[in-house]
Amino acid sequence: MSGATKFIKCVTVGDGAVGKTCMLICYTSNKFPTDYIPTVFDNFSANVSVDGNIVNLGLWDTAGQEDYSRLRPLSYRGADIFVLAFSLISRASYENVLKKWMPELRRFAPNVPIVLVGTKLDLRDHRSYLADHPAASAITTAQGEELRKQIGAAAYIECSSKTQQNIKAVFDTAIKVVLQPPRRRGETTMARKKTRRSTGCSLKNLMCGSACVV
């Protein structure tokens, strides 16, 4: 990248209690908050290096509760990328991606790309937790990938704030999606229509194992 450092505004959205704030705190401080405090993350801005590119990454946290529905879209102005999160142990948060969040994002920011993120990966296969929480419903990787296709997200990543698995990958991926020129994104879409070979994907370098699907 040449010239001035590019500023990227990244806004996290999703149902309340899916772990958006925890994800941001873990990414910026490498610490996992032990107590749940709704949306206490201050807006964050710092220079980040990804694949040799230095960008100034701005992170915006939003509250998912209905009480904030009128105020929340104010954070969307100027967004370059959305990190749309749902919990891998909450069927309701998964379903709300289509029912609630996509209509809202497409109304207020129709052309902004999305990275879909499944949070609380460490609990999906945690048998004792699932046994103690009958209302919990595990979402599979295949279901997450299907949702990614439905909403047209640029990538799908599963992560855990508690173990910090793939936390950095979430935001590295968001940065890479923004840095990829729009023309190239269009070419990627056309390539996928013409061939099913994975080698035609210009986002191939975003792959980060089985928990990250592009």
UniProtKB/Swiss-Prot annotation:
PROSITE patterns cross-referenced by the UniProt entry: RHO (PS51420)
Keyword terms of this UniProt record: Cytoplasm, GTP-binding, Lipoprotein, Membrane, Nucleotide-binding, Palmitate
GO molecular function, one term: GTPase activity
Motif placement: Effector region: 36-44
Broad class of the protein's primary localization: cytoplasm
Name of the protein in its database record: Rac-like GTP-binding protein 2
Topology of the protein relative to the lipid bilayer: Peripheral membrane protein
Modification comment: May be palmitoylated.
InterPro entries: P-loop_NTPase, Small_GTP-bd, Small_GTPase, Small_GTPase_Rho
A GO term from the CC aspect: cytoskeleton
Pfam families: Ras
